Amino acid sequence: FISYLFGLSILLPTQHWTGIYVGNLPWLILCFAQALIFILPALLMRRNHRANQLIFPLSYVIIELLLRTVPFTGFGWSRLSLTQTDSPYDSVYRQIGLAGMALVIATIVIVRNIKHILILAVILASVYFIPDNIIEEKPIAVALVQGGVVNLGLDFNNKPREVFMRHLNQTTFSISPSAVDLIIWPENAVDVDVFRNDDIRIQIEKLSQDLDTPILVGAVTRSSQGLNNQAILFEPKISQTYSKRYLTPFGEYLPLRSVAESISKYATRIDDFYPGKEFITFNVNGVKFNSLICYELINDSFTKENVNDFLVIQTNNATFGDTPQLDQQLNIARVRAIESGRGVAYVSTTGITSFIDANGKVTNSLDKFEPGTSIKEMTTYSGRTNVQKIGYSVEIISLGLLVMTLGYRRWKMDV
């Protein structure tokens, strides 16, 4: 019961924003269901048993694995391992990733022996001296455009072309020809289909041509399969397109539509999107980057892909209003910067549009809900961090050690 309350104490406040426009019931169902996962250590541990110092941290790694994978691809937003961007041991992200950070946090919580505490401190300090092969490369000048929206909420784009015009005008008035190497608009900045509305596509092409600069836009399009959430590069014609692969359950598709519609009247307003299938590397004048679109930034499986010169994250936060979601998502982007050893161009319709360096520090940012443009010369990088090399090894090893520890404890009891 205490473990369940612990789970609720984490989930209820941090995920309250999920119900801001759709009512409290979906938020409560999500949190009360996910809190069941936190019972795992209580089921495995025995009172005052020495093995608890192993079982608890190992089982907590599995808790976070379950949070990010089940049900319906999971919702790993509130993992404690995402909270250490300003801690003295933030470089753990670069070495052993989020799973490793979960292991470290849980170990710190349960260790009581002073000798073990000192050993742990030495191990954490040594993390800073583990080498990687991340190399600085040539810089690229990037402009991030935060055009804003008229209304916050689910109806942020109820007036067709309004969001597009705000980003078009902001770009026109704030960026001079050839001033930067790349202009980036956020997710949903183009609120009508560029493949079905020639006038919109032509305006973006003309803007790219007039500024002599490629423009990466976020757009919703419709294919024969259904809706697609895309990042589209204009140079000035459309040269490359990436379709979001990791869709938001109950946001971009409804896994249990009939049940969801009976719970919330807002469910009928959600159209199912069709996931993309391919990873795309964008190339602008020899500089390569990939884009994560909104919810994709919490998918740990994409970590190994973030090895291009820099990383772009495009998001639309208008549907979450003025809530902690904006700051939480920016913090997750900082984690991705640290673990990949890459600078991040993080651009949102409403905020908090920011540049993040390879150490996870925010170097430039725009005010929330105010239109603006942020320009910075970003350092690019090559090479892979250690966590990108080891993949899911920490989770696999933790699961194996947990099974072995439980088996050994059972064997000792039987002897």
State where each predicted segment sits.
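Membrane-embedded alpha-helical bundles of multi-pass enzymes
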Residues: 1-129, 322, 349-350, 363, ...
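Soluble catalytic domains of enzymes that build or remodel membrane lipids, polysaccharides, and related
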Residues: 133-389
